[in-house]
A protein has these predicted regions:
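Residue-level recognition of pore/gate-forming positions within transmembrane alpha-helices
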Residues: 11, 19, 41, 136, ...
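An internal, D/E-rich "acidic patch" concept
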Residues: 57-113
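Membrane-water interface segments at the C-terminal ends of transmembrane alpha-helices
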Residues: 22-28, 58, 66-69, 134-164, ...
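Hydrophobic alpha-helical transmembrane segments of membrane transport/permease proteins
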Residues: 15-65, 158-179
């Protein structure tokens, strides 16, 4: 219990450090947002006035503390480019990236767990060798290449969906889920292959341990031993890997959103970086960092349930 509390404390400390570094990074990189907005021909007086309006003339720590206090209340400031609250912009983009991330992760779980168990139970067989070969191919193909291929085959050739014709869940939930399926598959395929490989290796490693032979000596079948004992122990490293995968999906969605013209956080982030719209970029970076830290904390708590030894620490 003490270790769990320490873990949560470290999580909060990590968020503070990440927020500070994110805020600091955009203060030291070359370029002035005021000059970017007004142009290089603007007079020094106009630039100074805009910097004061944007709060860039105040001390760094004062601006950071004010930004953190605002962020805790859901106020990430005002966009330099669009002159609107960043929180309002996020409200329109987060559901898109959230739905894409959720669908991708569901696909990963739905296919990788059964396939990992299947290949481990039939290790060395023809199907296992075939799956290993397919996994190697899937892991070698970048998600954006898969996305382009899916767009060409299912969008342009078979016309199962209209490329670039984003459908909002609020307007048509069924049509939206169908459109999101293709970018979700693009993200999920290489990660399914990696998770299958990880789970297969973990199960095969557990099958070599003494408790498996003890279970067999008590009359338990291979199937019963696998599902009652082996799988629980084998899932520890897989859960940690899935946590990293859940975090990686958000990063991978940046390119996929471009390929499928999805109005999510990824596209907004790229546009904001190009425009030096620091409040938007800072907010996205902190939100992504929070997601990464959160899924790793959840992975630890799940592993604590799977492994009683962690609960005793």
């Amino acid at each position: 219990m003490k270790y769990a509390a320490k873990k949560i404390g470290l999580t909060l400390l990590t968020m503070v450090i990440v927020s500070f570094l994110a805020f600091l990074a955009f203060q030291v990189i070359p370029g002035d947002p005021a000059v970017k907005l007004l142009g290089t021909e603007a007079t020094p007086e106009r630039i100074a006035a805009l910097r004061a309006e944007m709060g860039l003339d105040r001390p760094f720590l004062e601006r950071y503390v004010q930004w953190v206090l605002g962020a805790l209340k859901g106020d990430f400031g005002t966009s330099y480019s669009y002159k609107m609250p960043v929180s309002s912009m996020l409200a329109g983009k987060l559901p898109v990236t959230g739905l894409l991330t959720g669908m991708s992760f569901v696909l990963i779980l739905a296919f990788s767990i059964p396939l990992g168990i299947f290949t481990a139970r039939h290790a060395g067989g023809r199907l296992d060798r075939a799956m290993t070969a397919v996994n190697q191919v899937l892991m070698a193909i970048p998600a954006f290449v898969t996305g382009i291929l899916l767009t060409y085959v299912f969008g342009l050739v078979l016309r199962w969906f209209v490329p670039g014709n984003y459908v909002s869940p609020g307007d048509n939930l069924g049509g939206s889920l169908w459109y999101f399926l293709f970018p979700a598959v693009s993200i999920a395929l290489p990660r399914v292959a990696m998770t299958v490989k990880m789970l297969r290796s973990s199960i095969l490693s557990e099958l070599q341990k003494d408790y498996v032979r003890t279970s067999h000596s008590r009359g338990n079948s291979d199937r019963a031993t696998l599902y009652r004992h082996v799988l629980r122990n084998a899932m520890g490293p897989v859960v940690s890997f899935l946590a990293m995968t859940a975090a990686d999906i958000v990063a991978g969605s940046v390119v996929i959103e471009q390929v499928f013209s999805l109005p999510g956080l990824g596209r907004m982030l790229l546009t904001s970086i190009a425009n030096r719209d620091y409040p938007v970029v800072q907010a996205v970076v902190v939100i992504v960092a929070f997601w990464v830290v959160l899924v790793n904390l959840l992975a630890y708590l799940i592993n604590q349930r799977l492994d009683p030894r962690l609960r005793l620490q």
